[in-house]
Amino acid sequence: AAKIIKVQDMALKTGSPVVGLIDSGGARIQEGVASLAGYAGIFRRNVLASGVIPQISVIMGPAAGGAVYSPALTDFIFMTAATSYMFVTGPNVVKQVLNETISPEELGGASVHAVKSGVADFVFNDDENTLRGVKMLLSYLPSNNIENAPYLATDDPADRIEESLRDLVPEDPDKPYDVRNIIRLITDKGKFLEIAENYAPNIIIGLARFGGYVTGIVANQPQVMAGTLDMNSSVKAARFINFCDSFNIPILTLEDVPGFLPGADQEHAGIIRHGAKLLYAYTRATVPKITVVLRKSYGGAYIVMNSKGIGGDYNFAWPTAEIAVMGPEGAIAILYHKELAAAEDPVA
């Protein structure tokens, strides 16, 4: 722990990113409480470095017990399929306490944390590709919160015309499409580093370049759940926006959202509290913020997705944009509820 703390202190002093390669079974219990104090020192420095220098955790094997908390405090977590695991209590403890038999992969494997928990931001098939992914991510990030993200000269003209963009957003408001196709057409060389690709896929987040300058992208994904906002997507996007704001990375929002996901499950689990995190992140961010309304922009979700009212710097509307207090079906149900109740066939 003392070695790790020394590196963390030096990184903060020099304004350098920290990459941690983690393969740990937890605290060495032979050292008693002293081992816990070592963990505490690491965690404290993770917190002090948050928003000051980029912190990346690479899980190269098991990360159990106290070893999982440091990665959880960092900005990005990489895992390797079939060889890396993260859990607070391992399968043996689960068996003893709950009498449940579960494998390390089922409990805290890469697929679990990439799809279900959202703990893992990137998953690769082997260690070599995992480390390549770390290098790719670092190529988009500044060394600290004082510097700007690396500029990369490009021969891709900013004013190029993409005729196919005219037809990518369907005129039918209920027809799904993949917003990634739009992202690839507008970014430099069509490159886009997507983050947390398999978690809360109804919203897309990632890094790209425009004219050589790094930009964070947040985009509703109509292909999944019609692009509605739920708890997981709200938290996912809010965390990314906070990171971009900390490290001077402008944010482009591509909006096509019919609203927040309705239902008792979402309400009981705290959609109000979690949805507010996205609202707070956008409002608090001081980096340049641009929004393009691609199609739907309804109700509270319209406000949350970087509307001008909460501080959006420039807001543009695609030709297919629809901005309203709610969708047409909901508006009809409220405005004409008496007529509908009296009608012989309300559906007609």
Question: Residue ranges of each PLM-predicted region?
Answer:
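Ligand-binding clefts of soluble mixed alpha/beta catalytic domains
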Residues: 1-348
